[in-house]
Amino acid sequence: MFGAHANDIYVTQSGDDLDLDITQDGQNNQVGNSTTASSVIGASATIDIDQVGNSNVLKFDVNGANYTGTFNVTGNSNDIDILCDSTGNNSSCGTVTASITMVGNSNDIDLDIGETTDASNTTATITSAGSDDSNVVAATIDGVSAILTITVDGDTNNWLLDIDGDGDVNGHTYIHTHTGGIADVDVVQSGIYDNMVTITTSGDNHDIDISQTD
């Protein structure tokens, strides 16, 4: 009988203009682990991570002025935790473009941007690319201008979104499109300028709560 094998990658990098590509194919693989994130500190970072398989862990912490992250996850029961500006180093993740695409069931995804200091500009997308069920997605974005777009296809999914910060003249924007049944969506959006939430849903047994404050 053969035991289950896993690949582990730990990244600790300091410096400008990083271009990092990681691909893991298999199960029980890790980039960082459940308690310690891989970390990058620098003025500019482009990160592309693909994980294929079940029960993988991806925990990554980025601090820098400009950050582009692309994360693709295919499989079930994966734990994804993407952090930006946990320590407030090096311009506090000023301009952020983040894209997370998942295909699979029972995944847990956390996206946290501007944890210590507001991010200046954030454009983030989270896409469920198939009929994906029983996923939990939490996104917390603190920033001056945030655009978050979520596209969901599947049943029994839970979405927890918190967007705050002063906002610029355009405020914050949240666009949510969902096809499927049994959805729990909680949106908290705040800022001193105009904020917009657009939700389009199709399916039964949806529980949607939206809170907007200046």
Residue ranges with predicted function:
Residues 6-214:
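Low-complexity repeat regions of mature extracellularly deployed or surface/particle-associated proteins
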Residues 1-5:
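C-terminal segment of classical bacterial N-terminal signal peptides
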